[in-house]
């Protein structure tokens, strides 16, 4: 059975940390493919503060060009209204039929997992893969993982990756302050930021 990773996010902008996480998940879990799923209108973020979805899609598409095992899906962008993870996973499960999905997300999501809508469906349609993030204690995360494993009769995969302290927020702030960011970004992404004059002072 084909194994497909699903890596969602606003990607505003996508950076080398995202590429590293997706690549490590691909290698460690022996996935056939990792699908990047740029968020449309995420329910947990202020929509007015997010770059236009078409531009974010363009940045992700450019960033993953060098990797044959990465792809991009526009389901959440094309779907009008709120985007919930369980709906995305259900869509992918029905679209691909005979596949095993691995939903890749950060440690912050594991801590707040009980607040996610229809969490049982997320576990029904996918294997949850959680990677560590700066500021989160590994032992606390593993304890939380065990609690959810028992509560939902599942087996969350924990990826102990390098803590790369790069964030989209940091990049936006640096661009806003006219500081260099190209070493944080995959090739071509900085050109798109320049093309649309993103994140700069108004």
Swiss-Prot record:
InterPro entries the UniProt entry points to: Cyt_trans-like (IPR004821), NadD/NMNAT (IPR005248), Rossmann-like_a/b/a_fold (IPR014729)
Reaction equation(s) it catalyzes: nicotinate beta-D-ribonucleotide + ATP + H(+) = deamido-NAD(+) + diphosphate
Gene Ontology molecular function terms on file: ATP binding; nicotinate-nucleotide adenylyltransferase activity
UniProt key word NAD: yes
Segments passing through the bilayer: none
Pfam families: CTP_transf_like
BP-aspect Gene Ontology terms: NAD biosynthetic process
UniProt function note: Catalyzes the reversible adenylation of nicotinate mononucleotide (NaMN) to nicotinic acid adenine dinucleotide (NaAD).
Family stated for the protein in its record: Belongs to the NadD family.
Protein name as it appears in the record: Probable nicotinate-nucleotide adenylyltransferase
Organism, scientific name: Clostridium perfringens (strain ATCC 13124 / DSM 756 / JCM 1290 / NCIMB 6125 / NCTC 8237 / Type A)
Phylogenetic lineage: Bacteria, Bacillati, Bacillota, Clostridia, Eubacteriales
